[in-house]
Regions:
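Terminal accessory carbohydrate-recognition/targeting modules of carbohydrate-active enzymes
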Residues: 13, 26-261, 295, 587, ...
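Long, well-ordered core segments of solenoidal/helical folds
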Residues: 269-277, 315-335, 376-394, 482-500, ...
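Sec-dependent signal peptide recognition
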Residues: 21-25
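The feature captures the catalytic groove of carbohydrate-active enzymes
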Residues: 212-230, 333, 337-355, 361-371, ...
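N-terminal secretory signal peptides that target proteins for export/translocation
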Residues: 1-18
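Catalytic cores of transferase enzymes with a strong primary signal for eukaryotic protein kinases
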Residues: 142-147, 155, 235, 239-293, ...
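Substrate-binding groove/exosite segments of carbohydrate-active enzymes
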Residues: 256-361, 365-366, 373, 381, ...
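C-terminal capping/lid segments that line or modulate ligand- or cofactor-binding pockets
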Residues: 44-73, 79-81, 347, 352-367, ...
Length: 661
């Protein structure tokens, strides 16, 4: 074990080689300890029994577990995969073959179009339309007890004279799991530790053709619907009936009247949830395209906490998994990084906005399971203390990037830089940070950040409430005092003239008039008086020259010169910003404003959801479009927060007794 760790570190950390030669035993021991910390090179920290049981419940049965393709069905825990591929035979394209299908296409290729339809939490029903090389077809799947059925249906007739396209079902065991697959005369048989799974084609098998498939497969020309079943042979009619039964069961989960928000959230998380074999876990990365581009998975800090909140409307175990796995990726320094990616690497230099405690407390208030608090309290407290110890500047907090933290992520050029500090804010190119002094010695952006302190004080409040439930009185006192301190700090950043909390340049002492929705985050911390909240809302949030209008809430006010850029955090609308502002409004007697924000957020979301089933990373605040730029992933789960706002306002209104008076 020690030799393996040292060998890996010689490759990753060449600066350590001299130290190893000079004092091999001591250095190796220190490095081994560092890499044995939770979440550094795999998941070392053991799961609690409760959480292990939750993960085992999740990682069962057939579902779209494989990150590389939404048309692949995988049986867990065995790892048996049935991959659905398409062959297109034309003079124009040659014998084109599509084996991996991603929503929005994958890195470097944008050939297929996917219109994701319903996806049940447990994979009991999935439905997607695929458009590729002039093919237009529908792929559905359903559970038949513990077995799987699939139905592939052409939606349009092929052009006269074209060679008939084909669908190809191949089988294999993923992730080096034990098992063998063989082709028999009328079926495929997969033999694994839990037994044999026969796989049957319902359709006319195509004559021999040379396909780029490395294992046994079943193929049929797409002259009409084609089916597949496991366990036993089924007719096309039987398969179609089973698919429709599961479709109707899915519809019943949406309530009466049918909830578009529940449909959107369940579908989004359904398609974005994968099995991550490196950590033997079920998680919901932001999108499959992002994960494939990052080597298999990438967990961004606040993004994945929001995924936990989204999942809570229908899948408790998945909600827990997303929150807990984000915390299990904490660095040796005790904070949750900006990202954690395949291969065990993460942003050791920087964190991201602290929304963990409010997420966990929200889950506890919904499900009332104490073990969740016991599982998460220690890493949440460590992270909370890290902000105070590493990002405080007198009475304020500022963002930073500690580029010399070990181990250095050498392929991340932003570590230790101004851009790295801005990345810690989560607002990669916000005009709020166009100016401001970056201290090369402290690696801090010397700006007292209103948004950060609002989120942090809310984090302290939520964590104090968790500490109280767990009977941790000293920690509760510590956290309440810290929340009070930063509320008082925020009070010094109130600008009476503008009627807004403003960021402060700590290098010059000047307040920064450039704002974003983060300037409303003091509402989350109850740091604004009712009178201040009223001014912020009336003079800024509802002001059509700033954050109001038909499409809300822009990341940059409409009267800022950067608004016209409509480029990422410069002017576009982001689900998490709307959601956090909405949570802040719940602390005040602003029911009408909340309802308007919920209505407008849902209207924005429903535009591309209805037309294309897109859930965008961000949206144009002048047109409401999401697909007008390449920098807006079309199926990024936090876009569904726009629908969650309306769901919360409809189903979980705050009590007037909770308002700040």
């Amino acid at each position: 074990m020690l030799k393996r760790v040292v060998r890996v570190l010689r490759c990753k950390l060449p600066a350590c080689q001299g130290a190893l030669r000079a004092g091999a035993a001591l250095c190796a021991m220190l490095l081994l300890l560092a890499y044995s910390a939770p979440g550094i090179y795999g998941q070392v920290r053991e799961r609690s029994q409760d959480y292990d049981a939750a993960q085992k419940r999740l990682a069962q049965g057939w579902n779209t577990w494989d990150v590389h393709s939404v048309t692949t069905q995988v049986l867990l825990p065995e790892g048996l995969a049935i991959r659905v591929a398409l062959q297109r035979k034309t003079t124009l394209y040659g014998d084109a073959f599509l084996e991996d299908v991603l929503i929005g296409g994958g890195p470097g290729r944008l050939t297929e179009q996917v219109f994701p339809g319903p996806h049940a939490w447990d994979g009991s029903y999935t439905d997607a339309r695929i458009v590729w090389r002039e093919l237009d077809l529908r792929i559905q799947s359903a559970h038949a007890g513990k077995e799987l059925v699939m139905l592939v249906t052409p939606l349009a007739k092929d052009k006269p004279g074209h060679l008939t396209p084909a669908v190809v079902f191949s089988a294999s065991y993923l992730w080096n799991r034990p098992g063998t697959v063989e082709r028999l005369a009328d079926r495929i048989e997969a033999h694994g530790p839990s037994g044999t799974v026969p796989i049957y084609l319902a359709g006319t098998e195509a004559p021999f053709c040379d396909l780029p498939v490395s294992g046994p497969y079943l193929s049929s020309e797409l002259k009409g619907p084609v089916g597949l079943s496991t366990g036993k042979r089924r007719s096309l009619e039987e398969i179609a009936q089973l698919v429709e039964e599961e479709h109707q069961a899915y519809e019943k989960t949406l309530g009466t009247p049918r909830s578009a928000a529940v449909d959107a959230i369940q579908t989004t998380l359904g398609w974005d949830t994968i099995y991550e074999p490196e950590g033997s876990r079920v998680i919901s990365p932001v999108s499959r395209s992002w994960s494939v581009g990052w080597g298999g998975f990438v967990l961004f800090d606040w993004d994945t906490f929001f995924a936990a909140t989204l999942a809570a409307i229908g899948d408790r175990d998945l909600a827990y998994a997303n929150a807990i796995e984000t915390l299990r990726e904490s660095t040796p320094a005790g904070f949750v990084g900006n990202y954690a990616r395949a291969g065990g690497w993460k942003s050791f230099d920087r964190s991201e906005p602290p929304v963990g405690a409010i997420t966990v407390l929200g889950l506890y208030k919904k499900f009332h399971e104490r073990w969740l608090l016991e599982e998460t309290f220690a890493p949440l407290l460590s992270w909370n203390r890290w902000w105070q110890e590493n990002r405080s500047a007198g009475m304020y907090l500022e963002y930073g990037s500690d580029g010399k933290n070990q181990p250095e992520n050498l392929d991340d050029d932003s570590r230790g830089t101004r851009q790295g500090a801005i990345f810690e804010s989560g607002l990669d190119n916000s005009p709020m940070y166009d100016e401001g002094f970056f201290n090369e010695k402290t690696h801090r952006l010397e700006i007292a950040d209103v948004g950060l302190m609002g989120l942090y004080a809310a984090d302290c409040d939520a964590l104090a409430e968790i500490a109280a439930v767990l009977g941790k009185t000293p920690e509760e006192k510590e956290l309440r005092e810290r929340a009070k301190h930063y509320r008082e700090s925020l009070a010094t950043l109130w600008d009476e003239k503008s009627g807004m909390f403003l960021n402060k340049d700590l290098h010059t002492g000047r307040l920064n008039p450039r704002t974003s929705p983060t300037n409303f985050y003091p509402l989350l911390a109850r740091a604004a008086t009712p009178q201040q909240a009223q001014r912020m809302i009336q003079e800024h949030l509802l002001n059509a020259q700033e954050f109001g209008g038909d499409w809300v809430i822009p990341a940059t006010p409409r009267n800022d010169p950067a608004f016209k850029d409509q480029n990422y955090w410069r002017g576009r609308i982001w689900g998490p910003m709307n959601y956090l502002v909405y949570l802040g409004l719940r602390n005040y007697d602003q029911a009408q404003v909340r309802e308007e924000l919920a209505r407008k957020s849902l209207k924005l979301f429903e535009g591309e959801w209805t037309a294309k089933h897109h859930v965008h990373e961000n949206y144009n605040s002048m047109t409401g479009a999401g697909d007008d730029v390449n920098s807006s992933d079309p199926f990024y789960h936090w876009g569904a927060l726009l629908a969650l706002i309306d769901y919360a306002e409809t189903n979980d209104k705050p009590s007037p007794g909770d308002y700040v008076h």
